[in-house]
Design a protein with these regions (language model features):
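Acidic-enriched and Gly/Ser
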Residues: 1-185
Length: 185
């Protein structure tokens, strides 16, 4: 099965929600809680004519609404618009932010991933309550940022309110657009 426009995916682990700990503790029982939806998908098929690097079997980090269920106007639980059938979903190329190909995570333009810097590291800006504001380390750049001279591991400054947190391989990362990177420090 192939789509002319969409990636055909299934949720990693066959789970729509990632709302339990390794010990079985339920973190959230609400279907409306976007913070516990599964954010990872396995590629079943790429779009017809797709010429990129992603192949079936690769893992995508997807938008929180891809696998989410909702309650309609009548109170009936329904899948969101990405659902195709059973555990199969169709996603557009703007609904994934990172992909794992040959064991390596990569970011497609216009997205990149920045690791926040905690206050234990040296920095000019210090906030005793959390991570350094508006500063991080470029964890996964993209071809556009690389063409501008940035590389993974560079310390960067980014625009306020541009960070959107994900947990990738146990590490907190901010997904943001390439245009949100302001300065290489």
């Amino acid at each position: 099965m192939k789509s002319p426009l969409y990636f055909v995916v299934e949720p990693v682990g066959d789970k729509l929600y990632d709302n339990t700990t390794d010990y079985g503790l339920v973190l959230s029982a609400s279907k409306e809680d976007h913070t516990v939806t599964n954010r990872f998908a396995t590629v079943i098929a790429t779009p017809i004519g797709y010429t990129g690097e992603i192949v079936p079997g690769d893992t995508l980090m997807v938008h929180h609404n891809v696998f989410r269920k909702y309650f309609d106007m009548r109170g009936k639980e329904v899948y969101g618009p990405s659902h195709f059938r059973d555990k199969t979903f169709l996603i557009d190329d703007d609904q994934y932010f990172l992909y794992k190909h040959d064991g390596q995570w990569k970011a497609p333009h216009p997205y990149c991933m920045v690791k926040p810097i905690d206050n234990l590291q040296e920095s000019v800006l210090v906030d005793p309550d959390r991570e350094q504001p508006l500063i991080g380390v470029l964890k996964y750049g993209n071809e556009y940022l690389y063409s501008k001279g940035l590389k993974d591991g560079d310390m960067v400054s980014f625009q306020p309110e541009s960070e959107y947190a994900f947990i990738v391989d146990g590490e907190k990362l901010y997904r943001m657009f390439s245009k949100n990177i302001c300065v290489a420090l």
